[in-house]
């Protein structure tokens, strides 16, 4: 388990869950060198731009990409408000599964995408349907949540079959 703490104005902080059907999802990768190491001078510029877009209310939600790639990030973003995603036809599976540590998936309104001003890959569109659509493949949100919860269900059960006490 790890976590980080920082100080910020609450008005400058966003949450990771998807906000609205019709919004676009974009993967923003940090610049890396031939050895796949971050080019820190360029990374700083990318992070500064993301921060400005968040403060300006342009980026609606964001999630840091981890070991499960953009696919994991998008799924966890969708779980919060139970919104679905249709991935763009141009997106390949490797675009979604490559870890790309230090990078982000961001949600923006369609009308604001041109304001990004940093390289990004359009991943797809947020929908109000409770499913993920990638080409001909469809996974319901319920299936995805159940699969996500399953590994730790025995350790941290989300429900019990014990006696229920009704309190007046």
Describe each model-derived feature in a short phrase.
Residues 47, 51-168:
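Glycine-/charge-enriched secondary-structure boundary and capping motifs
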Residues 12-17, 29-30, 35-39, 72-76, ...:
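Short acidic, glycine/serine/threonine-rich loops at helix termini
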Residues 19, 24-30, 35-60:
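A glycine- and small/hydrophobic-rich beta-loop-beta segment
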Residues 5-10, 39-47, 88-91:
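A general structural motif
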Residues 1-33, 104, 108, 122-125:
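Glycine-rich anion-binding loops of enzyme active sites
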